């Protein structure tokens, strides 16, 4: 039983570390409290789920939105350049945001944690909006399909990438859009995140220079309905946050209608525990882990959810206020900057933070960096324990463990990694809600300790000497090999795909008039 003793000591140590970090973050998170905005109550309402009696589950086939020939969407961003030069030119500057981090190469633990899932091959931090189509084409996760029916991913993987998506849903209906493989949309989804994703570009208000904000993706409107909101009648604060919720949210692919429909799991709430409860009740899993056999969940990018739990969300400060702040051109005309500044504290302080905060830029930069370091420290501790839990589960299976013996330990792994992923996939959670991030990670540490304690008992029962020997995953190359991923083969196939298939997609899209020029090919730095 030595394994149980070791793991229980570890549990106490890691939980203490998480609590210390949590206390520090909570002390620093008060910087904006004195400047609470008048929209506090409205923002609070946005966080609340609809009454239980109003809640429902994923839509049935009959409830999916049909073809809508009356909904006209001009997806080509370039066509708005002449009428809206300031907004368009600032949006085009997202092309300057070429840098991203190759996350799984920087942190090979992820390769193990995502074993059996495409994220183990490649996962990168985000860059400029203009690269959304380019990056989903180039990433190893989407494979190298040779025709419209090939490849590993469904059509739904295009859903956040640009305004061609609502155009296609209007033309094909939801069932038609969400059916089939990702490659089906290769010559159709060609305009990256842009104008018609957020604006009703055909309306008179838009032509008159008003924002005319709109959500044109039916699954997003259904999700807002679950929290008691109707986009069209919502106030400006809710709408400004709601358009970002087109994409910056947690979602899953529901297959009950025969397609891969995008659904937001908000039926019990939008916090990590409520979403987990929903997934558990419907028996959903994103995949089965390749070595531990745990039924895993993959958080997407729950920025909207985590923002709503933080100081800014609670006080009605929206994504647009910080990342797309008002600015002036050389003639003094005020407009919304569409460059989408990733780090406004460093890169746009006077137009954002300084409008509410009395602290200096240096002070706030140090505060945010400390939050990030605190979250990162405990997150890596959780990753270390998750990696060990997956290998320990594999060892238990290899030594004759049964499904009945393993089910509780595997469920604990599922819940622990879900919490890690919820915090990790929301790239700015250290800024949006650092105290919430640390609470989530601390609860993940508790659950992985529970998993490892259960596994220690199972391993001892089957005569396994503990601690077990863990493989060397100190580099991405070593981790890929341990997890059975032939990364060079994947890369060569993708290179051929980029060279041969993508030019044909671009050629077809241009011939149809869907784009004027092909999506950018600037490589990431």
UniProtKB/Swiss-Prot annotation:
GO cellular component labels: outer membrane-bounded periplasmic space
UniProt-annotated binding residues for Ca(2+): 250-251, 298, 300
Catalytic activity: 6 Fe(III)-[cytochrome c] + NH4(+) + 2 H2O = 6 Fe(II)-[cytochrome c] + nitrite + 8 H(+)
Domain of life according to the entry: Bacteria
Cofactor: Ca(2+); heme c
GO biological process: anaerobic electron transport chain; nitrate assimilation
Top EC class of this enzyme: oxidoreductase
Positions with a binding annotation for substrate: 251, 301
Signal sequence residues: 1-32
Molecular function GO terms recorded: calcium ion binding; heme binding; iron ion binding; nitrite reductase (cytochrome, ammonia-forming) activity
Main location: periplasm
EC number: 1.7.2.2
Residues reported to bind heme c 2: 195, 198-199, 338
Localisation per UniProt entry: Periplasm
Low complexity bias (residue ranges): 43-53
Binding annotation for heme c 4: 319, 322-323, 432
Involved pathway(s): Nitrogen metabolism; nitrate reduction (assimilation)
Family matches, as PROSITE patterns: MULTIHEME_CYTC
Chain positions recorded as heme c 5 binding sites: 312, 353, 356-357
Family: Belongs to the cytochrome c-552 family.
Physiological role: Catalyzes the reduction of nitrite to ammonia, consuming six electrons in the process.
Protein name: Cytochrome c-552
Organism: Mannheimia succiniciproducens (strain KCTC 0769BP / MBEL55E)
Gene that encodes it: nrfA
């Amino acid at each position: 039983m030595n394994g149980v003793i070791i793991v229980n000591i570890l549990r106490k140590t890691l939980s203490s570390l998480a609590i210390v970090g949590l206390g520090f973050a909570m002390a620093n998170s008060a910087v904006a409290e004195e400047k609470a905005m008048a929209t506090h109550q409205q923002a609070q309402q946005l966080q609340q789920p609809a009454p239980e009696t109003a809640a429902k589950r994923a839509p049935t086939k009959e409830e999916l939105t049909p073809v809508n020939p009356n909904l006209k969407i001009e997806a080509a961003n370039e066509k708005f350049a002449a009428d809206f030069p300031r907004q368009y030119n600032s949006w085009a500057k997202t092309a300057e945001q070429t840098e991203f981090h190759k996350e799984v190469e920087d942190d090979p633990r992820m390769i193990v944690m995502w074993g059996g899932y495409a994220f183990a091959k490649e996962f990168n931090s985000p860059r400029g909006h203009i690269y959304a189509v380019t990056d989903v084409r180039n990433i190893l996760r989407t494979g190298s399909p040779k025709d419209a029916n090939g490849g590993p991913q469904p059509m739904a993987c295009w859903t956040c990438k640009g305004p061609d998506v609502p155009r296609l849903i209007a033309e094909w209906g939801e069932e038609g859009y969400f059916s089939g493989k990702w490659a089906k949309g290769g010559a159709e989804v060609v305009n990256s995140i842009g104008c018609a994703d957020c604006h009703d570009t055909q309306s008179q208000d838009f032509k008159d220079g008003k924002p005319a904000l709109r959500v044109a993706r039916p699954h997003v409107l259904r999700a807002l309905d679950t929290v008691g909101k109707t986009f069209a009648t919502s106030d400006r604060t809710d709408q400004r946050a709601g358009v970002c919720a087109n994409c910056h949210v947690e979602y899953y692919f529901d297959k009950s209608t025969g397609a891969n429909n995008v659904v937001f799991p908000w039926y019990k709430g939008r916090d990590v525990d409520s979403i987990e409860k929903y997934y558990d009740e419907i028996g959903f899993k994103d995949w089965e882990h390749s070595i531990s056999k745990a039924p895993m969940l993959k958080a997407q990018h729950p920025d909207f959810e985590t923002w709503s739990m933080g100081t800014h969300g609670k006080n009605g400060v929206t994504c647009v206020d910080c990342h797309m702040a008002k600015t002036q051109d050389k003639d003094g005309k005020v407009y919304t900057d569409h460059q989408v500044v990733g780090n406004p504290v460093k890169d746009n302080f006077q137009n954002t933070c300084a409008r509410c905060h009395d602290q200096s830029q240096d002070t706030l930069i140090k505060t945010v960096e400390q939050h990030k370091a605190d979250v990162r420290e405990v997150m890596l501790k959780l990753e270390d324990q998750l990696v060990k839990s997956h290998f320990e589960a594999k060892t238990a299976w290899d030594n004759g463990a049964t499904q009945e013996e393993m089910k509780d330990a595997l469920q604990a792994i599922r819940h622990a990694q879900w919490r890690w992923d919820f915090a990790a996939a929301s790239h700015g959670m250290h800024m949006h809600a650092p105290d919430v991030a640390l609470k989530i990670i601390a609860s993940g540490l508790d659950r992985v300790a529970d998993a490892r304690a259960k596994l220690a008992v199972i391993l001892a029962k089957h005569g396994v000497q503990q601690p077990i020997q863990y493989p060397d995953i100190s580099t991405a190359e070593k981790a890929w090999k341990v997890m059975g991923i032939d990364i060079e083969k994947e890369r060569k196939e993708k290179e051929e795909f980029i060279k041969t298939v993508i030019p044909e997609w671009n050629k077809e899209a241009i011939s149809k008039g869907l784009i004027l020029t092909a999506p950018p090919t600037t490589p990431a730095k």
